[in-house]
């Protein structure tokens, strides 16, 4: 937000419009007759009320995202030509100088209150491009169960915000819907808890001033965190409870984040439970999950990476399997389903981030032969020159499919 204050109270209600400046300009030489070009689109506006002094705010969120990438020419504040009165604003040389307010929130995952553009790659899954921050979340259904006693279905999630991490043995940027974690952070001198859900969204919890063992959810999802003697619980408004081990470490200025703790149990309002068991020597890797009907889904690992997920009725050759390839910084993940159908995921490495650039449903892979794609989604990113500290946002998505041997384009979308 850009915040400004008027110097004089206007004699009539006055509108102020905010526009993006399109070219560089010099504050020492700029004049009314020699101004840089500005956008024809209003970023925001406000109305200064007659005979009042007040602070006014302009929402410049979309511009701030461009500024992160280096394109910053500022904004122009002006009154519509139809206005008969005017409003004079304080400059940077006064006590009431203009200022910016930047508010940060984790928008890394999928939330119902955010807006996304979705792309289908058939069997390979669904991509979701955030229209707020350009982040990519890609989901792939691994296993499915039915029933009334908390059945367990496992979904793979790729999150481009986390694509510099391989914390769960699922590949860079990947986790499953069951890889839910809890840790502490030091923020503005206060210790807060961070719950990360199954698609990578971070939910921050701040201490309740009236109860030192309880924390409230700042994302306004009506979640309550409570620190007990043996564990930590998070309860939602439907009385569903998630249980985590105690996070005993305390973050410091030198180490502002603690290690993460994996979820142990999920319980619904009537007492049905899902129990998550971690690998003994790798506390963030899941060994097995037991649902409310005592059905056990197991995850198996080779060289630290998950190579298959088995439901109770499956064996090692007839389940969802994962194969990882890395040749000269060209990474590929193949997923093979129980029925032999396959999905393929390709990555580009940029500044330590493993960016998903293609997700495809393919015919069965044959070594030394090019894969035949049945459905495909490809992505392009900003900051491809990999400048450290700048985000990798989706700028383009293309969806194609094959019909009667012909490749057809279903969607071709640019994001700005």
Protein language model annotation of sequence segments:
Residues 1-108:
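Secreted, disulfide-rich extracellular signaling modules
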Residues 18, 99-192, 200-202, 220-226:
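Intrinsically disordered, low-complexity segments enriched in small residues
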Residues 5-7, 21-23, 63, 80-82, ...:
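Solvent-exposed coil/turn segments that connect beta secondary-structure elements
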Residues 8-14, 28, 163-164, 274-275, ...:
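Short acidic, Gly/Pro-enriched loop/turn segments at secondary-structure junctions
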Residues 26-30, 106-121, 285, 308, ...:
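Low-complexity, Pro/Ser/Thr- and charge-rich linker/hinge segments at domain boundaries
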Residues 154, 160, 170-174, 180-416:
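Extended charged/polar low-complexity repeat regions
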Residues 1-2, 18, 58, 100, ...:
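Residue-level detector of buried hydrophobic side-chain packing
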Residues 12-14, 54, 71, 85, ...:
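Residues that flank catalytic or metal-binding motifs in active/ligand-binding sites
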């Amino acid at each position: 937000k850009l915040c400004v204050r008027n110097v004089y109270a206007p004699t009539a209600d006055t509108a102020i419009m905010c526009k993006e400046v399109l070219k560089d300009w010099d504050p020492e030489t700029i004049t009314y007759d020699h101004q840089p070009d500005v956008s024809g689109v209003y970023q925001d506006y406000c109305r200064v009320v007659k005979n009042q002094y007040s602070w006014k705010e302009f929402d410049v969120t979309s511009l701030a995202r461009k500024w992160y990438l280096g394109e910053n020419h500022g904004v122009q504040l002006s009154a519509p030509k139809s206005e008969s009165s005017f409003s004079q604003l304080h400059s940077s040389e006064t006590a009431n100088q203009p200022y910016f307010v930047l508010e940060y929130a984790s928008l890394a995952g999928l939330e119902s209150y955010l807006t996304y553009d979705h792309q289908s790659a058939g069997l390979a899954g669904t991509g979701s491009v955030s229209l707020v921050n350009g982040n990519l979340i890609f989901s792939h259904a691994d296993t499915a169960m039915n029933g009334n006693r908390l059945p367990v279905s496992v979904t793979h999630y790729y999150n481009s915000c986390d694509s510099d991490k391989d914390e769960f043995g699922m590949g860079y940027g990947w986790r499953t819907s069951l890889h839910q974690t809890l840790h502490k952070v030091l923020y503005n001198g206060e210790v807060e808890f961070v719950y990360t859900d199954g698609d990578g969204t971070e939910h921050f919890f701040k201490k309740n001033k009236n109860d030192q063992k309880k924390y409230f959810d700042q994302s306004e999802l009506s979640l309550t965190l409570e620190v007990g003697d043996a564990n930590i619980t998070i309860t939602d408004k439907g009385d569903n409870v998630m249980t985590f081990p105690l996070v005993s470490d305390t973050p410091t200025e030198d180490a502002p984040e603690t290690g993460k703790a994996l979820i142990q149990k999920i319980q619904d309002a009537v007492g049905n439970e899902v129990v998550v068991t971690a690998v003994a020597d790798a506390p963030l890797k899941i060994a097995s999950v037991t649902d409310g009907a005592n059905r056990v889904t197991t995850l198996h690992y080779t060289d630290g990476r998950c190579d298959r997920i088995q439901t109770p009725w499956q064996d090692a050759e007839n389940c969802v399997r994962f194969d990882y390839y890395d040749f000269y910084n060209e990474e590929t993940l193949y997923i093979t389903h129980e029925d032999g159908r396959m999905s393929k995921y390709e990555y580009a490495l940029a500044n330590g981030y493993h960016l998903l650039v293609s997700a495809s449903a393919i015919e069965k892979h044959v070594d030394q032969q090019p894969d035949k794609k049945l459905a495909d989604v490809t992505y392009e990113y900003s900051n491809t020159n990999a400048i450290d500290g700048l985000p990798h946002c989706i700028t383009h998505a293309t969806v194609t499919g094959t019909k009667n041997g012909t490749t057809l384009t279903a969607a071709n979308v640019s994001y700005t």
